[in-house]
């Protein structure tokens, strides 16, 4: 299965890394992105002016509960402002999105610690390095910054979502849908479920997160699943969870089973996935 957003997201993440030590210029560019499409910059600080920002919060600007039309408009403006060569996507299958009311990865100025945003940049940089070359040194560097960020204000499962956005073939997203899907023996091997279930009851530390992602990839490589990588898994988890939610609606309405047209729709989507 092809995910056209991956090339754009990966290239944009690499572009953002060059602004790690030049955030004033980055903030100017973000303001320009919104000005070009006549949209208001979302509230990212206690006042109206952006003081500082991290790369995952920037990704969150177009990965939250907004319309696809607005998402495409923002991404298109980003492409022009940052010189992104990858095609601007118009399909976003397999992408987890943030709650609009919890869309920053940091607390506002009076609530966050001095190094909070710097720490997020550091785990962002370490994640890209680890995705580029998976070795012990890069794992240690990633783990150091991940564990620092893990305990910061406003960091929840969104940390795993951010890692997935920037390098989706290297990092697993552990949003609620994926956690639900991964811990069901109908979807993953029983030994995998037993090994990871207790590790994802709450946001895992770096060692547990790396264990979950590595164990998942091993299971996908060794099993005969329709999903062979994290993006396919994420998409499939979304698709099946939507099916289950719809079944619950029908049951509450007094139906014994889904209407035939819905069965056919699910069957078609399963074969596509």
Per-region residue spans from a language model:
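An N-terminal alpha-helical hairpin/helix-loop-helix interaction module that forms a charged
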Residues: 1-152, 168-248, 252-254, 258, ...
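Short hydrophobic alpha-helical segments that form membrane-spanning helices or hydrophobic packing faces
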Residues: 159-166
């Amino acid at each position: 299965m092809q995910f056209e957003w991956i090339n754009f997201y990966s290239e944009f993440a690499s572009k953002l890394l060059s602004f790690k030590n030049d955030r004033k210029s980055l903030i100017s560019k973000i303001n320009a992105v919104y000005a070009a499409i006549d949209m208001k910059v979302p509230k990212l600080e206690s006042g109206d002016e952006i003081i500082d920002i991290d790369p995952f919060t920037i990704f969150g600007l177009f990965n939250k509960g907004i319309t696809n039309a607005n998402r495409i408009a923002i991404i298109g403006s980003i492409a022009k402002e940052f010189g992104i060569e990858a095609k601007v996507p118009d399909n976003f299958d397999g992408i987890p999105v943030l709650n609009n009311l919890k869309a920053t990865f940091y607390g506002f100025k009076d609530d966050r610690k001095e190094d909070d945003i710097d720490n997020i940049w550091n785990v962002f940089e370490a994640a890209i390095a680890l995705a580029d070359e998976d070795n012990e040194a890069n794992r240690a560097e990633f783990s150091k910054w991940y564990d620092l960020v893990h305990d910061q204000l406003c960091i929840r499962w969104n940390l795993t979502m951010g890692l997935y956005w920037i390098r989706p073939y290297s990092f697993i997203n552990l949003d609620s849908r994926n956690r639900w899907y991964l811990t069901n023996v109908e979807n993953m091997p029983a030994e995998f479920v037993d090994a990871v279930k207790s590790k994802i009851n709450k946001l895992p530390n770096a060692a547990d997160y790396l264990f979950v992602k590595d164990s998942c990839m091993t299971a996908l490589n060794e099993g005969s699943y329709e999903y062979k990588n994290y993006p396919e898994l994420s998409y499939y988890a979304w698709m099946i969870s939507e099916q289950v939610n719809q079944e619950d609606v029908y049951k509450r309405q007094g139906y014994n089973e889904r209407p035939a047209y819905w069965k056919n729709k699910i069957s078609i989507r399963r074969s596509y996935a």
